[in-house]
Amino acid sequence: SDSGKSYDFNVASDLNNLLVNALLATGQLLPDNEYDFDFDHQFIETEKFDAKITYKKFTGYSPGIATVGDVIVGIENRDGNTNVRFHQEDTLKRIFERLENARIHINRARMDCGSCSEAMVEMVEKHSRHFYIRANRCVSLYDDIFALRGWKTEYINGHEFEICSI
């Protein structure tokens, strides 16, 4: 890392290729179809010898996991003490390119605030038709959004949302 810290990182390319190929072979993914894509880091508590303390104060791992619908399409493991932003752009690029090589197209990509950076937005925009990346909480952004006029209530998939165009 830029700070001089050392992290263990496993991109598991062969296993991720096998995973996507198995999903195609079993018909769980179909080439030339569009899918919704989700990415997040999961914290897995474990007492294995190589596990490290996470910022959540337990020993474990924090792999980045990508799903399409209800199937996992990519996993890259990292130390529990690795910042979620560390090489996340590289992780997502590998996963998106693996799916594109299999002719799997991403309609909508969703990620949490760990993916909120200009570089991530630019990269995700290249690999999906639409995307949602939750912004980091920030007082000035909250104030700007609160000041917007024209909010309206919409129901999407049975859930009520307040929406407004910027």
Each PLM stretch: what is its role?
Residues S1-I65:
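Active-site-proximal, Lys/Arg-enriched surface segment
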Residues Y55-A102:
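Electropositive, glycine- and tryptophan-enriched low-complexity nucleic-acid-binding patches
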Residues E47-I53, V73-N77, M111, E118-V124, ...:
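Short acidic, glycine/serine/threonine-rich loops at helix termini
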